[in-house]
Amino acid sequence: MSDKPASMYRDIDKPAYTRREYITGIPGSKIAQHKMGRKQKDADDYPVQISLIVEETVQLRHGSLEASRLSANRHLIKELGEEGDYKMTLRKFPHQVLRENKQATGAGADRVSDGMRAAFGKIVGTAARVQAGEQLFTAYCNVEDAEHVKEAFRRAYNKITPSCRIKVERGEELLIA
């Protein structure tokens, strides 16, 4: 069965449901890694720091976080090479557990379905709660690679729901000159 539309889980309208020690059957996170690029190099070694900042308070499902991470990282690998001199971090982790009260449809569904009886729902996935103004991705790079990082972030925010902006946190004076 396919996933429900992200609009069902986008708004933060329920209390946090994150206590994994009490919840069984949580599917694994689709996010393969949170740190990409040259992991052994320190972030302070790079002159430019660029972040993707979310402008709305939303929940982002782990599938969309992985899709945006993959899109950005693939672009950077393609442009800067497999051993490219950059470091990128996904800053959010999907702690929020999502539930869904499945409904039967079609002929005879009224006899099979329980309706709203025992409507707590089954676990279907996880999501990250992101507040407005928080950083979703941060990349550290050299001055000549900054445009590639901005393009990678543009591709990343096309994969997620909220509007985002790309902000140069450090080294803006180097990019203007």
Swiss-Prot record:
Keyword tags: Ribonucleoprotein, Ribosomal protein, RNA-binding, rRNA-binding, tRNA-binding
Pfam families: Ribosomal_L16
GO cellular component entries: ribonucleoprotein complex; ribosome
InterPro entries membership: Ribosomal_uL16, Ribosomal_uL16_arc, Ribosomal_uL16_CS_euk_arc, Ribosomal_uL16_dom, Ribosomal_uL16_euk_arch, Ribosomal_uL16_sf
GO biological process: translation
Domain of life (superkingdom): Archaea
Single GO MF annotation: structural constituent of ribosome
NCBIfam families documented for this protein: PRK04199.1-4, PRK04199.1-6
Family as reported in the entry's similarity comment: Belongs to the universal ribosomal protein uL16 family.
Subunit and partners: Part of the 50S ribosomal subunit. Weakly binds 5S rRNA. Probably binds the A and P site tRNAs.
Function: This is 1 of 5 proteins that mediate the attachment of the 5S rRNA onto the large ribosomal subunit, stabilizing the orientation of adjacent RNA domains. Modeling places the A and P site tRNAs in close proximity to this protein.
Record-linked PANTHER family: 60S RIBOSOMAL PROTEIN L10
Designated name of the protein: Large ribosomal subunit protein uL16
Gene name, Swiss-Prot/TrEMBL: rpl10e
